[in-house]
Amino acid sequence: MRPGRREALILGAVGVGAAAAGALFGAFALQSRTGAAELLAHAFVDLAGKPRRLVQWKGKVMVCNFWATWCAPCREEIPLLIAAQQQYDAKIVQIVGIGIDHADKIVEFSSQLKITYPLLVADASAVDTMKQLGNRSGGLPFTVVLDRGGAVASTKLGALKPGELDLILAPLLR
């Protein structure tokens, strides 16, 4: 094969790869924007049974944590989230727990751990919302951080580790 032809084939392959990566990233970005809009508009209920939407906290950095009382890693990370809500001014950062569980179990669990941030109750449709936000497996815990404008800044499947949330929030609070 002539050197010119070989270089052209390599450049063509690189171009196709770059186009595919761009399309994949674009699809993920669109999926994240759609998922964020749906998350903000989704009608949850609070522990008193009143309808609540996350859009009420738009303008703040939001840490939306999907969890369940039966999920061991979820239970382990809750003290970290309680500490984070105490550390950060609620005027700037709002942590919201979205329980995929029965309200009575969430109420009981919340009183045991003295959870200080708002807890909302989700139905099974929350799994679809999580999938739109990139959690294809629907696993828990799943944390979505939204910037002040309501766009997805970060997602994390699995329990947050100490200090990890600080690293995620730091650039959003500048």
Show which residues each predicted segment covers:
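Thiol/disulfide oxidoreductase modules built on the thioredoxin-like
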Residues: 112-115, 123-170
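N-terminal targeting signals for export/organelle localization
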Residues: 1-41, 45
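Structural microenvironment flanking redox-active thiols in thiol-disulfide oxidoreductases
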Residues: 75-114, 124-130
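Aromatic-flanked redox-active Cys/Sec active sites in thiol-based oxidoreductases
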Residues: 65-70, 100
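A short beta-strand-turn-helix
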Residues: 41-61
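Conserved hydrophobic/aromatic "anchor" residues
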Residues: 42, 66-67, 109, 117
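Alpha/beta-hydrolase fold active-site loops
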Residues: 61-62, 141
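C-type cytochrome heme c attachment motif
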Residues: 69-76, 142
